[in-house]
Amino acid sequence: MRLPLFDDIGERSLWTFENLVSRNGFHAVAGVDEAGRGPLAGPVVAAAVILPQGAELPGVDDSKKLSAPKREHLFGLISGCALAVGVGVADHACIDRINILQATLRAMAEAVGQLAVPPDYLLIDGISTIPLNLPQKTIKKGDSSSISIASASIVAKVTRDRMMMEYDQQFPGYGFAEHKGYGCASHLAAIAELGPCPIHRKTFRGVKEHVAP
């Protein structure tokens, strides 16, 4: 078994990276992605997905390009056909304690650890590797070029959105159900008026200015 070479892979499809890795002897390839690095409130959620080779998932793409109903539909398809799905969560307190990058990597590692099928290779969206002793490849915009990463992006996004809908019930007035914690004008105005709530990220600009000394 040798590590795959990604330098010249020619014309690409959403299965290109998975197929290349499989041809090099790896058979449990997990795509890993996150949702929620940028918001001012709530957790960062990561997902890891292992798909059966050649699985047909029409419509799967970067979750940010899909409508909420489309994501929910695809979430069901992915959950039904995947060999394994894992989810990891780093909450607001963890983010404030160790910073958003380290919290994201921790959530990703947790997601991989939750997989019922142990992966032998990881495809990761972005530029940062996960602190796990597994062969892995980071892919910029991987959620638009890898079927496994795209699937993980959908699982992570839907999972986090559902959490933020619940937080909207616990902490009314901030509009979490609408903006999911992102720093839009209405959210910033709510923070200025009401002050931060328990799930706000106290180290983030837009929130820290309103934290009592």
UniProtKB/Swiss-Prot annotation:
Signal peptide: none annotated. Keywords: Cytoplasm, Endonuclease, Hydrolase, Manganese, Metal-binding, Nuclease. One of its GO terms (biological process) is DNA replication, removal of RNA primer. Its EC number is 3.1.26.4. GO terms for molecular function: manganese ion binding; RNA binding; RNA-DNA hybrid ribonuclease activity. Manganese or magnesium. Binds 1 divalent metal ion per monomer in the absence of substrate. May bind a second metal ion after substrate binding. Its cofactor is Mn(2+); Mg(2+). The keyword Hydrolase applies. InterPro entries: RNase_HII (IPR022898), RNase_HII/HIII (IPR001352), RNase_HII/HIII_dom (IPR024567), RNaseH-like_sf (IPR012337), RNaseH_sf (IPR036397). GO terms for cellular component: cytoplasm; ribonuclease H2 complex. CDD domains: RNase_HII_bacteria_HII_like. Residues 27-213 form the RNase H type-2 domain. It catalyses: Endonucleolytic cleavage to 5'-phosphomonoester. SUPFAM superfamilies: Ribonuclease H-like. NCBIfam families: PRK00015.1-1, PRK00015.1-3. HAMAP family: RNase_HII_B. PANTHER family: RIBONUCLEASE H2 SUBUNIT A (PTHR10954), RIBONUCLEASE HII (PTHR10954:SF18). This is Ribonuclease HII. It comes from Geobacter metallireducens (strain ATCC 53774 / DSM 7210 / GS-15).
